[in-house]
Amino acid sequence: MLFDYLVVGQIVTMNPASSVRGPKYVIKRGKTPILSAEDTRKLIDSIDTSTLIGLRDRALIAVMVFSFARISAVVGMNVEDFYVNGKRSWFRFQEKGGKHHEVPAHHNAEAYMDAYLIAAGISADKKTPLFRTVARRTGRFTPRRLHRTDALRMIKRRARDAGLPATICNHTFRATGITTFLLNGGTLENAQAIAAHESPRTTKLYDRTNDEITLDEVERIRI
């Protein structure tokens, strides 16, 4: 402001501070709430799998947790996008920009998906939605694809029933999976590959492994 005033008053010919830029603000930590491994297991185990809805919900949550997938990519899957290649089951996701991304299925996610598909009876309908809405009157699946907002309502309800924070959301499971992977010795590079992130900086936003370390350090202040 001062130099601009001096330039206008022709006291100086140029503003020497015009090329100076303040420090760039860089976000180093995401805001998505995460769950501990124990609370994630608590949530999954709390789901009543004696119903089709329960089997669907458990499978959907497992796919997000164990493959770090975005909710849009998960609900966008067709039946054919859970497939066997060699001796392993795989997930195929359509990511942003129309790119396809394939991830081997974790054994828990594979088991939950198999149980869901057998009960739903949709294994042969390869070109149809994998995760579907349910008709309230009959309790049977409709041909309609589950929407991300349907998934969010389900997750909020499941979290409440399990006594977990209502703040968790669809993205929670992506962040939870990445953090748990890193805590158990996984590398940031491999987490990036599984999550299909363009940059490791994006993956790092989901990494909350330092949260516990930071708390331990703060607790050193013994007053």
Task: Put a short name on every predicted segment.
Residues 1-223:
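Conserved catalytic core of the tyrosine transesterase superfamily
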